[in-house]
Amino acid sequence: MPPKGRQGAAKKVRRKEKKNVAHGHAHIKSTFNNTIVSITDPSGNVISWASAGHVGFKGSRKSTPFAAQMAAESAARRAQEHGMRKVDVFVKGPGSGRETAIRSLQATGLEVGSIQDVTPTPHNGCRPPKRRRV
């Protein structure tokens, strides 16, 4: 009786195809604890992303401007492999890595077309949580 299991059936591994996108959007979400950079095509499909935690920072070091710089560089390099050359930047959040992430996108060779602040602000909507007493 032959042993159970697969017999000579090789598993097919699908390679990730390279999209050729020259222009896209860079979404930078900068919170007090982390910075997330997502680079998308104009219709919103994510081409590359990186965050301060994904790059290798842990704990309170994720919230530093240097961590935001490294995350933006990592996302930009991967987007350039897909042919990205120009981005429009959308910045969201109050964190410390906002300007540093934009500067590092420019430094890696991506041409920054426009910069927009899309931080959501309430028109006096929900009641905020009570103040912290430390």
Swiss-Prot record:
Disulphide-bonded residues: none
Complex formation: Part of the 30S ribosomal subunit. Interacts with proteins S7 and S18. Binds to IF-3.
Region forming the signal peptide: none
Stretches with biased composition (Basic residues): 9-22
GO cellular component terms attached to this protein's record: ribonucleoprotein complex; ribosome
Region (Disordered): 1-22, 114-134
Keyword match RNA-binding: yes
Family recorded in the similarity comment: Belongs to the universal ribosomal protein uS11 family.
Role description: Located on the platform of the 30S subunit, it bridges several disparate RNA helices of the 16S rRNA. Forms part of the Shine-Dalgarno cleft in the 70S ribosome.
Keyword Ribosomal protein: yes
Protein name, UniProt field: Small ribosomal subunit protein uS11
A molecular function GO annotation: structural constituent of ribosome
Gene name as annotated: rpsK
